[in-house]
Amino acid sequence: MTLNEIARKMCAKGKGILAADESTGTIAKRFKSINVENLEENRLNFRQSLFNASAMKDYIGGVILFDETIRQKTTLGPTIPELISNHGAVPGIKVDKGAKPFAGSSNETITEGLDGLRERLKEYYDLGARFTKWRAVYNIGDKLPSLQSIKSNAHALARYAALVQEAKMV
């Protein structure tokens, strides 16, 4: 698929993007609230049932995955990305490494993850990802965001976008 075709499929009328990229720590909190042990098997069963739902075809255009999830094979046979594709959605992957304190500022952040991104994108493409998620956090307030924060995050976003398109992903 071309980048345009991927984007159109993800954003088809009536469809949305499912953010299923929770870390093992985040899903542990959710499981704890319903008394489910945070085991890889339980995480796989949860995700498999979610992505195997018949409503996927009608309402979901894309699914953002976490590193663990994109590598999992279902008990049904296909990998998680294949299961998502079989249900008409585009598999994607979270590729940033989180917002970290921005040097020289006590109230701002910069998103990390550009180091090694080209290699990670190739691996994620081979695993079935066709789009990516990267977030930049801007704190809004008195004299915030600073011009330096805006420029630094914009530069990181531009480098990220160029690498993603080079890898044939959205």
Where are these regions (language model features)?
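Helix-rich catalytic cores of soluble enzyme domains
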Residues: 115-170
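Alpha/beta catalytic barrel-like cores
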Residues: 1-127, 140, 149
